[in-house]
């Protein structure tokens, strides 16, 4: 099969607005020992793409510093964490049987080789990603999903959004019969949380607004709460016995509605990074605040099992060609959509 010598890609050479996304003709990367070369079938967009491009992650002790996910980025950088495609070449020491297989790439760069390793870097940030026709990845991080009934577009939506959601659900120890509250339910992670929590047998309450409410209900939420109305009042009506797990922001007003031993799992800062709450509601009720950055290798393996069996149905909000990456990111930033935005090289 093989690959050509050059490819189309979209890179950033500095932090800034959508205008720093530059189409380029670059050399196709060569898979090193232990790596594979993947022809990109689809790449999904994430808030991480916007924050990385803007340098919005801050640094310890300096929250306003321009920074990538885990520190300074090496420019120029090809963005894009979420890739589905086919293996077209393998590096030294890699089983040639992977060639031709349909795969999803785990974009995390881990702090170790164990099953519970933590992500300390991300494809598209700490190494080149999938805003391109081809991308390399460690062979240990590509998962064969040839048998999955999902399309490449759907598979590409899984790594960051569904990986983050599954990490939240696992770290929050959500079990069958419990009640989970999903805030920001119309986004990629929100829809993923709803679908995975439903598959787990939990009761799902979701917060959304306006025209998105119907789509969030269609995604599987048992009850959709209107952000424009009194949230605590709606929660008390929908779950008088309280909430077991909160997935997302809203801590101040929702913390008193957690059950004894309830868990609040945070995986982002879209609602702002400066949060105030009454710490007495935390310790008097044995509640927990849990930070959750993406997923572990174990979590990602569980996610790929769901994908092979087709037990989740990702929602595609829009599709763009690769050369419209700036427009695709602007669409993502407007937050008018439900589900995931994908690009097809």
Give the location of each predicted region:
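C-terminal hydrophobic helical "lid"/dimerization subdomain
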Residues: 1-5, 167, 297-345
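Mid-domain Rossmann-like dinucleotide-binding core that forms the NAD(H)/NADP(H) cofactor-binding site
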Residues: 98, 150, 155-229
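Conserved "cap/hinge" positions at secondary-structure junctions
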Residues: 91, 107-108, 184, 208, ...
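Glycine-rich phosphate-binding loop and adjacent beta-alpha segment
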Residues: 120, 249-315, 345
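NAD(P)H dinucleotide-binding glycine-rich loop of Rossmann-like/cofactor-binding domains
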Residues: 69-72, 106-184
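Glycine-rich beta-strand-centered segment in the early N-terminal region that forms part
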Residues: 27-44, 58-109, 148
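Short amphipathic alpha-helix with an adjacent loop that forms part of the alpha/beta core around
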Residues: 231-240
């Amino acid at each position: 099969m093989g690959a050509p010598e050059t490819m189309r890609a979209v890179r950033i050479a500095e932090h800034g607005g959508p205008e720093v996304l530059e189409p380029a003709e670059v050399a196709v990367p060569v898979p090193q020992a232990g790596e594979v070369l993947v022809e990109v079938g689809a790449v999904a967009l994430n808030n991480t793409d916007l924050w990385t491009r803007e340098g919005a992650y801050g640094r310890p002790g300096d929250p306003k510093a321009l920074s990538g996910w885990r520190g300074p980025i090496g420019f120029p950088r090809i963005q894009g964490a979420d890739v589905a495609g086919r293996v077209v070449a393998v590096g030294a020491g890699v089983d040639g049987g992977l060639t031709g297989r349909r795969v999803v790439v785990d974009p995390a760069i881990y702090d170790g080789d164990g099953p519970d390793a933590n992500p300390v870097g991300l494809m598209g940030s700490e190494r080149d990603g999938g805003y391109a026709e081809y991308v390399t990845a460690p062979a240990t991080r590509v998962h064969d999903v040839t048998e999955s009934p999902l399309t490449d577009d759907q598979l590409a939506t899984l790594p960051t959004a569904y990986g983050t959601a599954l990490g939240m659900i696992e770290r929050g120890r959500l079990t069958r019969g419990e009640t989970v509250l999903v805030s920001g339910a119309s986004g990629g992670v929100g829809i993923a949380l709803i679908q995975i929590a439903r598959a787990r047998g939990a009761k799902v309450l979701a917060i959304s607004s306006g025209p998105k409410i119907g789509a969030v209900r269609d995604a599987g939420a048992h009850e959709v709460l209107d952000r424009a109305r009194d949230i605590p009042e709606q929660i008390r009506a929908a779950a008088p016995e309280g909430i077991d797990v909160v997935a997302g922001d809203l801590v101040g007003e929702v913390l008193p509605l957690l059950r004894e031993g309830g868990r609040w799992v945070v995986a982002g800062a879209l609602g702002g990074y400066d949060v105030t709450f009454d710490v007495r509601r935390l310790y008097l009720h044995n509640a927990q605040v849990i930070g959750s950055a993406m997923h572990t290798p174990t979590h990602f393996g569980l996610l790929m099992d769901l994908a092979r069996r087709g037990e989740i149905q990702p929602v595609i909000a829009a599709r763009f060609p690769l050369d419209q990456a700036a427009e695709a990111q602007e669409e993502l930033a407007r937050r008018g959509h439900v589900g995931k935005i994908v690009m097809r090289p």
